[in-house]
UniProtKB/Swiss-Prot annotation:
Glycans are attached at residues 4, 18. The lineage of its organism: Eukaryota, Metazoa, Chordata, Craniata, Vertebrata. Disulfide bonds join 21-185, 96-189. Belongs to the G-protein coupled receptor 1 family. The chain crosses the membrane at residues 34-54, 68-88, 103-127, 147-167, 197-217, 261-281, 292-314. This is Trace amine-associated receptor 8a. It comes from Rattus norvegicus. It comes from the Eukaryota. Residues 1-33, 89-102, 168-196, 282-291 are extracellular. Its main location: membrane. It is found in: Cell membrane.
Amino acid sequence: MTSNFSQAPLQLCYENVNASCIKTPYSPGLRVLLYMVFGFGAVLAVCGNLLVVISVLHFKQLHSPANFLIASLASADFLVGISVMPFSMVRSIESCWYFGDTFCSLHSCCDAAFCYSSLFHLCFISVDRYIAVTDPLVYPTKFTVSVSGICISISWILPLVYSSAVFYTGISATGIENLVSALNCVGGCQIVVNQDWVLIDFLLFLIPTLVMIILYSKIFLVAKQQAVKIETSISGSKGESSLESHKARVAKRERKAAKTLGVTVVAFMVSWLPYTIDTLIDAFMGFITPAYVYEICCWSAYYNSAMNPLIYAFFYPWFRKAIKLILSGEILKSHSSTMSLFSE
């Protein structure tokens, strides 16, 4: 007796290799669409953040402690776009890892390190904005270039050390050796982390996030009070002193910068919260999340690396002007670094 139903042949990542992972390919049309969407995100992350870095480093008018933090943040997002997203794109769409076990560990380590670096940068930027808004006249003496350098160093060194410890010592797999062995196959790159380290990861996301929420809540409260005070001062006295006028201008500028970077922080939290919650649920409830849901959460987080330059371009006229000068080749001219980017 023959069956009327034909079963689709099982596809493997490596057809002629024992213990190969099973391949679950998408339809050709969907594969093309996904490559376009994911590829666009990677290109945008690379090009957009490269423009931010070039702008801050080239134009002397942008050489400030706060902007150095922004350039360092853009460097982390640039590295996500160039060293993480392209390989994750192939893994997500082909459902196979074709780049070897050694690079799998390196890729996973870089993925975690650069993303935590972004989070640390944003946390320090929140501190910077809090000082700038609450005490704008004293701010230049408190948040100096050396302080900014210390913040940048911490934002890079701690994530790199932590990620290396997690992915290269094997400590994160303690207690789940059987699960790791069951998931191990040729053509896979699934780094499984035990519940303790997933909880640590969650706290590393939650604590800086809470710090940023508290600081920005205080920032906008102070900004509102300043706006009311300035409005009352102007309406009550037409002959405003030059000092008060200067203080009002400085406060207004810092409030605008805080608002822009506040949007950046919100974008980061919205992008990363689904992924963080998903990994927490999977670790404590037995990996119940469907693969496609995990991929959506993962790429939502990746796309955050491409969003910051778009936010800067929308809110910062100086960044739009810098982009024009860079793309037109004007920065190749002598003395271009001293060009004015701000309209007075």
